[in-house]
Amino acid sequence: MMISGLRSSFSFFTLVPSRQKDIGNPITFLPLVVTVGALIGDSILYITWQFSHLIASFLSISSIIIYNGLNHFDATADLGDALMVRDKSRIPEVIKDHHVGAGGIFAVIFVYGIAVLSLARSTLYIGLVGILIGQVVSGSSMMISLIGSQPFVPGLADYFISLFRKHSVGYTIEFLAIPIIVSFIFSPLYVVIVALNLLIVQLTKTMISRRFGGINGDVIGFLGEFSRSLFIFMLIIIAHYNVASTYDIFSKMLSSFTS
């Protein structure tokens, strides 16, 4: 059962292939999936940081996008195009359209540009922490967005909402507790950033849901990407103004490796 759940999570949320025809329940092990993505992004950031902060940041975020199979990247572009549509009845048609318009291009540049530029302006330590917690918050944001939601078209959102409702209390606790615990390990202040991040993302979901008449897979994917970028941006601002101390045990360990 556990192996099947792991396969479902990795095959659905990443480019890792699987022979399973039924996607099963990919929700439970999503925190593990996003953590692996964070380790990939952090590894690339750490290795390439000495050459160019901007290139290192770009490669790190790109590696996570590729690890996700470009699914959420595509979702971000689709949502950007859909938000440009004035006629509500045309939204499902625009989201399914494979062509990318001005709205989609802007959404991609905005969401990923925030993450890349923020990382490039940070220290290596803050960048590594930002990617790790940002990934965890990203996964939680996607799942928490299912609470009280309705799909505006039949599809993956409908399936995920039904899965979530079967264990709504357990999943809600899981996806709220994990980012809080992970962020608290580094700094209690990061818990505040996580809480504010989740609140902003859920408010964003509410506005999109009212505009579209519900959510779909693209909305869920976009919220995850937006959440990661938003967390990294917020963390870098806090660190820039020295509100959060980076002189903890993890910072000292990293300094010993890089010195």
UniProtKB/Swiss-Prot annotation:
Residue stretches spanning the membrane: 27-47, 51-71, 100-120, 124-144, 175-195, 219-239
Function, as annotated: Joins adenosylcobinamide-GDP and alpha-ribazole to generate adenosylcobalamin (Ado-cobalamin). Also synthesizes adenosylcobalamin 5'-phosphate from adenosylcobinamide-GDP and alpha-ribazole 5'-phosphate.
Reactions mediated catalytically: alpha-ribazole + adenosylcob(III)inamide-GDP = adenosylcob(III)alamin + GMP + H(+); alpha-ribazole 5'-phosphate + adenosylcob(III)inamide-GDP = adenosylcob(III)alamin 5'-phosphate + GMP + H(+)
Gene: cobS
One Pfam family hit: CobS
Family under the similarity heading: Belongs to the CobS family.
Pathway: Cofactor biosynthesis; adenosylcobalamin biosynthesis; adenosylcobalamin from cob(II)yrinate a,c-diamide: step 7/7
Cofactor: Mg(2+)
One record GO biological process: cobalamin biosynthetic process
Membrane association type: Multi-pass membrane protein
NCBIfam families for this protein: cobS (TIGR00317)
Keyword set, alphabetical order: Cell membrane, Cobalamin biosynthesis, Magnesium, Membrane, Transferase, Transmembrane, Transmembrane helix
Subcellular location: Cell membrane
One Gene Ontology CC term in the entry: plasma membrane
UniProt protein name: Adenosylcobinamide-GDP ribazoletransferase
EC number: 2.7.8.26
Lineage: Archaea, Methanobacteriati, Thermoplasmatota, Thermoplasmata, Thermoplasmatales
One GO MF term attached to the UniProt entry: adenosylcobinamide-GDP ribazoletransferase activity
InterPro entries linked: CobS
